[in-house]
Design a protein with these regions (language model features):
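Short catalytic micro-motifs in class I SAM-dependent methyltransferases
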Residues: 111-112
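A conserved beta-strand element that flanks and buttresses the S-adenosyl-L-methionine
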Residues: 108
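Class I (Rossmann-like) S-adenosyl-L-methionine-dependent methyltransferase catalytic domain
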Residues: 1-39, 43, 48-99, 116-123, ...
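Short, conserved loop/helix-junction motifs that constitute active-site signature segments
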Residues: 130-133
Length: 291
């Protein structure tokens, strides 16, 4: 992303005129069913001219606009006025945004993803998913078509977002293809809407946070957690006892799911070496004992 910022700084005035020549409703019509509601907290990443941020503010949302280009940020803040909060931040770090300690009902990443190097996208997506409120929506638009100027762009795909969504426990709700609204023949777009499910108690999101952000140093704990989640999803009636804020499950059921999910991994043997839990190849899995 940083390699393209000088272009946006140099051409901010022209680009803002170009972006503001089309309306939010026209550009984002494909995901109208997911537009923000009054009172929603919205994060607009790569806010550019402020067109989208201003529209969402007028719709009743509380909008924070993220823009790494100083010139675009200046132009955009003038366009929206003080009702929209502007922050100098960027993917994949979003460090200043994280420091706000906020969660958002909608995160819009419009015309940004193609600037991110593929090696940065997993981290960026994890940051975005962690900023979502329960039932929050993450909307990413994908630009297809090479730039004819000094901006840096990389290939993008819906399949990549589907994979990243699965890894971060998000659900893909909507995918749409559309022509370029600025009538550039060599450019076309896809829009992907993803959501963070919520069970109503907030516990699902706590568990999700552990799974997504665990450093994997204790793999058996993560494996057990995933096993319990599978049981909770498929066999809620298997609970033996629910008193004292705890539940009891048949150990045989836990063992069965554990074996079904992880026995094949334990059996892996590549040139005499099995799957490793430790950087020391002489050590096996910590939870596998001789007896």
């Amino acid at each position: 992303m940083s390699s393209s910022i000088p272009f946006y700084d140099k051409n901010a005035h022209t680009l803002c005129q170009q972006y503001n020549s089309v309306t939010f409703e026209t550009v984002h019509k494909s995901w109208q069913a997911y537009w923000p509601l009054e009172g929603d907290k919205v994060l607009d990443i790569g806010a550019g001219s402020g067109r989208d941020a201003l529209w969402m503010h007028k719709a009743g949302a509380d909008v924070i606009a993220i823009e790494p280009s100083a010139s675009l940020r200046e132009q955009g803040s003038k366009y929206t006025g003080p009702s929209v909060t502007w922050i100098d931040d960027s993917l994949p770090s979003l460090s200043r945004t994280e420091n706000l300690g906020m969660r958002f009902e909608l995160i819009l990443v419009s015309a940004v993803w193609m600037h991110l190097a593929p090696s940065h996208r997993e981290r960026a997506f994890r940051k975005l998913s962690n900023l979502l409120a329960p039932n929050g929506k993450l909307v990413i638009t994908l630009r297809h078509g090479e730039f004819q100027d000094s901006r840096q762009g990389y290939e993008v795909s819906v399949e990549e977002l589907e994979r990243l969504s699965k890894n971060s426990a998000l659900l893909v709700r909507h995918v749409d293809d559309s022509q370029d609204r600025l009538n550039r023949n060599e450019v076309w777009w896809q829009t992907v809407v993803m959501t963070l499910p919520d069970d109503g108690s907030g516990d699902l999101n706590k568990v999700r946070h552990i799974i997504v952000n665990d450093n994997k140093s204790a793999t058996y704990k993560l494996a057990l957690l995933r096993t319990l989640l599978r049981i909770a999803d498929a066999h809620s009636g298997a609970v033996i006892d629910r008193t004292d804020g705890k539940i009891s499950l048949p150990v045989g059921l836990v063992a069965l799911y554990w074996v079904r999910q992880f026995k094949r991994l334990i059996d892996i043997d590549i040139e005499g070496v099995g799957i490793q839990q430790n950087s020391n190849t002489s050590k096996g899995l910590g939870f596998v004992k001789d007896d």
